[in-house]
Regions:
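Extended, low-polarity transmembrane helix blocks
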Residues: 1-87, 97-196
Protein backbone atom coordinates (compact mmCIF):
# COMPACT_ATOMS: atom_id res chain seq x y z
CA UNK A 1 0.00 0.00 0.00
CA UNK A 2 2.87 2.36 0.80
CA UNK A 3 4.35 1.82 -2.66
CA UNK A 4 1.07 2.87 -4.28
CA UNK A 5 1.08 6.06 -2.20
CA UNK A 6 4.69 6.80 -3.17
CA UNK A 7 3.87 6.15 -6.83
CA UNK A 8 0.88 8.52 -6.71
CA UNK A 9 2.87 11.19 -4.88
CA UNK A 10 5.65 10.94 -7.46
CA UNK A 11 3.11 11.06 -10.30
CA UNK A 12 1.68 14.34 -8.99
CA UNK A 13 5.17 15.82 -8.60
CA UNK A 14 6.20 14.75 -12.12
CA UNK A 15 3.03 16.16 -13.68
CA UNK A 16 2.57 19.35 -11.66
CA UNK A 17 3.02 21.53 -14.76
CA UNK A 18 0.28 19.86 -16.74
CA UNK A 19 -1.97 19.52 -13.68
CA UNK A 20 -1.86 23.25 -12.88
CA UNK A 21 -2.70 23.99 -16.51
CA UNK A 22 -5.50 21.41 -16.51
CA UNK A 23 -7.05 22.99 -13.41
CA UNK A 24 -7.01 26.40 -15.09
CA UNK A 25 -8.47 25.08 -18.36
CA UNK A 26 -11.23 23.01 -16.73
CA UNK A 27 -12.19 26.02 -14.63
CA UNK A 28 -12.26 28.03 -17.87
CA UNK A 29 -14.71 25.53 -19.37
CA UNK A 30 -16.95 25.94 -16.31
CA UNK A 31 -16.91 29.72 -16.74
CA UNK A 32 -17.59 29.39 -20.48
CA UNK A 33 -20.69 27.31 -19.74
CA UNK A 34 -21.82 29.81 -17.09
CA UNK A 35 -21.34 32.69 -19.53
CA UNK A 36 -23.07 30.94 -22.43
CA UNK A 37 -26.09 30.13 -20.26
CA UNK A 38 -26.67 33.86 -19.70
CA UNK A 39 -27.56 34.24 -23.38
CA UNK A 40 -30.39 31.71 -23.38
CA UNK A 41 -33.86 33.07 -24.11
CA UNK A 42 -35.70 34.19 -21.00
CA UNK A 43 -32.69 34.60 -18.72
CA UNK A 44 -32.89 38.39 -18.79
CA UNK A 45 -36.59 38.22 -17.94
CA UNK A 46 -35.94 35.98 -14.94
CA UNK A 47 -33.00 37.94 -13.47
CA UNK A 48 -35.06 40.56 -11.57
CA UNK A 49 -37.12 37.82 -9.91
CA UNK A 50 -33.94 35.86 -9.09
CA UNK A 51 -32.43 38.90 -7.34
CA UNK A 52 -35.71 39.61 -5.55
CA UNK A 53 -35.97 35.98 -4.41
CA UNK A 54 -32.39 36.09 -3.12
CA UNK A 55 -33.44 38.82 -0.69
CA UNK A 56 -36.36 36.83 0.73
CA UNK A 57 -35.72 35.58 4.25
CA UNK A 58 -32.45 37.47 4.59
CA UNK A 59 -31.69 39.38 7.82
CA UNK A 60 -33.14 42.88 8.07
CA UNK A 61 -29.74 44.54 7.90
CA UNK A 62 -29.22 43.01 4.42
CA UNK A 63 -32.58 44.16 3.02
CA UNK A 64 -31.26 47.55 1.77
CA UNK A 65 -28.57 45.68 -0.20
CA UNK A 66 -31.08 43.42 -1.93
CA UNK A 67 -33.58 46.25 -2.35
CA UNK A 68 -30.97 48.34 -4.15
CA UNK A 69 -29.98 45.52 -6.49
CA UNK A 70 -33.56 44.44 -7.11
CA UNK A 71 -34.53 47.96 -8.22
CA UNK A 72 -31.33 48.45 -10.23
CA UNK A 73 -31.58 45.15 -12.11
CA UNK A 74 -35.32 45.56 -12.72
CA UNK A 75 -34.68 48.85 -14.55
CA UNK A 76 -32.70 47.12 -17.32
CA UNK A 77 -32.35 43.34 -16.86
CA UNK A 78 -31.08 42.79 -20.40
CA UNK A 79 -28.10 45.05 -19.77
CA UNK A 80 -27.14 43.23 -16.57
CA UNK A 81 -27.60 39.76 -18.04
CA UNK A 82 -25.54 40.63 -21.12
CA UNK A 83 -22.83 42.35 -19.06
CA UNK A 84 -22.52 39.43 -16.65
CA UNK A 85 -22.49 36.96 -19.55
CA UNK A 86 -19.77 38.89 -21.39
CA UNK A 87 -17.67 39.22 -18.23
CA UNK A 88 -18.01 35.49 -17.57
CA UNK A 89 -17.02 34.66 -21.16
CA UNK A 90 -14.05 37.03 -20.90
CA UNK A 91 -12.89 35.29 -17.74
CA UNK A 92 -13.42 31.93 -19.47
CA UNK A 93 -11.28 32.90 -22.47
CA UNK A 94 -8.54 34.26 -20.20
CA UNK A 95 -8.53 30.97 -18.27
CA UNK A 96 -8.66 28.75 -21.35
CA UNK A 97 -5.82 30.53 -23.14
CA UNK A 98 -3.83 31.62 -20.09
CA UNK A 99 -4.10 35.28 -21.07
CA UNK A 100 -3.63 38.18 -18.62
CA UNK A 101 -3.89 35.69 -15.78
CA UNK A 102 -3.15 38.06 -12.90
CA UNK A 103 -5.88 40.44 -14.05
CA UNK A 104 -8.24 37.57 -14.90
CA UNK A 105 -7.78 35.90 -11.51
CA UNK A 106 -8.25 39.16 -9.63
CA UNK A 107 -11.29 40.12 -11.70
CA UNK A 108 -12.63 36.60 -11.28
CA UNK A 109 -12.50 36.90 -7.50
CA UNK A 110 -14.52 40.12 -7.58
CA UNK A 111 -17.01 38.88 -10.19
CA UNK A 112 -17.52 35.68 -8.19
CA UNK A 113 -18.18 37.67 -5.03
CA UNK A 114 -20.70 39.90 -6.85
CA UNK A 115 -22.51 36.83 -8.18
CA UNK A 116 -22.45 35.26 -4.72
CA UNK A 117 -23.69 38.40 -2.96
CA UNK A 118 -26.47 39.43 -5.36
CA UNK A 119 -28.27 36.68 -7.32
CA UNK A 120 -27.09 33.91 -4.97
CA UNK A 121 -28.00 35.94 -1.88
CA UNK A 122 -24.78 35.03 -0.05
CA UNK A 123 -25.93 31.43 -0.40
CA UNK A 124 -28.75 32.03 2.08
CA UNK A 125 -31.03 32.39 3.75
CA UNK A 126 -29.63 29.79 6.08
CA UNK A 127 -31.97 27.49 7.90
CA UNK A 128 -32.83 23.83 8.40
CA UNK A 129 -33.17 23.23 4.64
CA UNK A 130 -29.84 24.88 3.67
CA UNK A 131 -27.44 22.52 1.92
CA UNK A 132 -24.61 24.80 0.72
CA UNK A 133 -23.34 28.35 0.75
CA UNK A 134 -23.57 28.97 -3.00
CA UNK A 135 -21.13 28.50 -5.85
CA UNK A 136 -19.88 32.08 -6.15
CA UNK A 137 -17.82 31.95 -2.98
CA UNK A 138 -16.27 28.63 -4.05
CA UNK A 139 -15.36 30.17 -7.42
CA UNK A 140 -13.65 33.05 -5.57
CA UNK A 141 -11.59 30.55 -3.56
CA UNK A 142 -10.58 28.71 -6.74
CA UNK A 143 -9.33 32.00 -8.22
CA UNK A 144 -7.34 32.63 -5.04
CA UNK A 145 -5.91 29.11 -5.34
CA UNK A 146 -4.89 29.84 -8.96
CA UNK A 147 -3.11 32.99 -7.71
CA UNK A 148 -1.24 30.95 -5.11
CA UNK A 149 -0.31 28.34 -7.73
CA UNK A 150 0.97 31.08 -10.05
CA UNK A 151 2.97 32.74 -7.27
CA UNK A 152 4.41 29.40 -6.16
CA UNK A 153 5.26 27.82 -9.51
CA UNK A 154 5.71 30.89 -11.69
CA UNK A 155 4.84 31.17 -15.37
CA UNK A 156 2.93 28.43 -17.12
CA UNK A 157 4.53 27.54 -20.43
CA UNK A 158 1.12 26.32 -21.64
CA UNK A 159 -0.32 29.81 -21.71
CA UNK A 160 -0.55 32.70 -24.11
CA UNK A 161 1.10 34.83 -21.43
CA UNK A 162 4.23 32.68 -21.59
CA UNK A 163 4.53 33.23 -25.36
CA UNK A 164 4.05 36.98 -24.98
CA UNK A 165 6.53 37.19 -22.08
CA UNK A 166 9.24 35.55 -24.18
CA UNK A 167 8.95 38.39 -26.72
CA UNK A 168 8.04 41.23 -24.36
CA UNK A 169 9.37 40.84 -20.80
CA UNK A 170 7.27 43.71 -19.44
CA UNK A 171 4.16 41.56 -19.99
CA UNK A 172 5.13 39.75 -16.78
CA UNK A 173 3.73 42.67 -14.78
CA UNK A 174 0.30 42.06 -16.32
CA UNK A 175 0.37 38.28 -16.40
CA UNK A 176 2.21 36.94 -13.39
CA UNK A 177 1.74 36.97 -9.64
CA UNK A 178 5.35 37.55 -8.68
CA UNK A 179 6.62 35.87 -5.55
CA UNK A 180 9.51 37.19 -3.48
CA UNK A 181 11.58 34.26 -4.72
CA UNK A 182 11.14 35.00 -8.42
CA UNK A 183 11.20 38.82 -8.21
CA UNK A 184 14.65 38.92 -6.64
CA UNK A 185 16.14 36.34 -8.98
CA UNK A 186 16.51 37.61 -12.51
CA UNK A 187 17.42 34.35 -14.20
CA UNK A 188 16.01 31.73 -11.88
CA UNK A 189 12.39 31.98 -12.92
CA UNK A 190 13.07 30.84 -16.49
CA UNK A 191 15.15 27.92 -15.21
CA UNK A 192 12.25 26.90 -12.98
CA UNK A 193 9.82 27.23 -15.92
CA UNK A 194 11.58 24.41 -17.70
CA UNK A 195 10.62 22.12 -14.85
CA UNK A 196 6.97 23.05 -14.97
Amino acid sequence: MASIQVYLDNWFVRHVGSLKTAIRVVFGVVWAIDGALKFQPGVADSLPQMVSDAGQGQPGWLQPWFGFWSQTVSANPGFFTTTIGLLELSVALALLFGFMRKIAYTGGVFLSLVIWSVPEGFGGPYGPSSTDIGTGIIYAFVFLLLMVINATFGPSRWSLDYAIERRWAAWTRIAEIRSAHSSGDSGGSHAEEALV
